A protein has these predicted regions:
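A structural signal for alpha-helical segments
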Residues: 16, 23, 43-53, 81, ...
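Extended glycan-interaction surfaces of carbohydrate-active proteins
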Residues: 1-20, 57-141, 173-197
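Peripheral, non-catalytic segments that deliver or gate enzyme domains
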Residues: 21, 134-158, 166
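Active-site-proximal structural scaffolding
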Residues: 21, 31, 51, 55, ...
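Well-ordered alpha-helical scaffold segments within catalytic/enzyme domains
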Residues: 26-45, 92-102, 147-160
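Alpha-helical scaffold segments in carbohydrate-active enzymes
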Residues: 27, 34-41, 50-68, 164, ...
Length: 197
């Protein structure tokens, strides 16, 4: 369900739930890797190995189930059918960086390009019939998702590109203040005009 991820009205969840997407599993993989590193630091080699193995297994599972021909999918849990969506949420596995196979990284990069506007990443591709400029997860730019996407791109060595997008985002903040989210086309602030992440 969209409430699990916080993207409650995303078009990825437009069908009746439950849905499975790779975003939350990607975050869980990162957490497992951190637990592995922490266990190693504490001298708990077996626990470290266990968490690393769990991370690797989950990564392989999401690649096998939630990606088709390298393309991230929103999959209906009961039927296994993919839901058509132009949501940025399917790009969030980019946080896994180099853990992703080349084909998957390239497919996510293609989707990111379609979500990119002058100011950053729209949460729904602007050419989508379901795009809403002030529609929460159906169009606006959000600071947290921008940071997550840019962090993944940075890990992939896209440093100049990340700096450019960050500069544009900062320019939007300078122009519009720091609201909860921004109109992805105009850069104007939406909703709470003094939001702090």
């Amino acid at each position: 369900h969209g409430n699990d991820s916080g993207w409650d009205n995303s078009t990825a969840f437009i069908e009746e739930p439950p849905m499975a997407l790779p975003d939350l599993s990607a975050f869980l993989i990162l957490q497992m890797e951190e637990l592995s590193a922490l266990a190693e630091e504490l001298g708990k080699a077996e626990e470290s190995k266990l968490w690393k193995e769990r991370a690797d297994i989950l990564c392989q599972k999401i690649l096998n189930i939630l990606f088709r021909d390298g393309e991230p999918q929103a999959v209906h849990t009961f039927t296994g059918e993919a839901v058509e969506t132009k949501s940025l949420i399917l790009c969030l596995p980019i946080v896994l960086g180099k853990r992703l196979p080349d084909e998957v990284r390239e497919k996510i990069m293609q989707r990111l390009r379609l979500c990119q506007t002058e100011w950053g990443y729209a949460t729904e591709q602007p050419d989508s019939q379901l795009y809403i400029s002030d529609g929460y997860w159906r169009g606006p730019i959000w600071a947290p998702t921008t940071m997550m996407v840019l962090d993944g791109l940075w890990q992939l060595g896209e440093h100049e590109f990340v700096r450019e997008v960050a500069k544009r985002f900062a320019g939007m903040v300078q122009k519009s203040g720091f609201p909860e989210n921004f109109d992805s086309v105009t850069g104007a602030g939406n909703r709470d005009r003094a939001f702090s992440w």
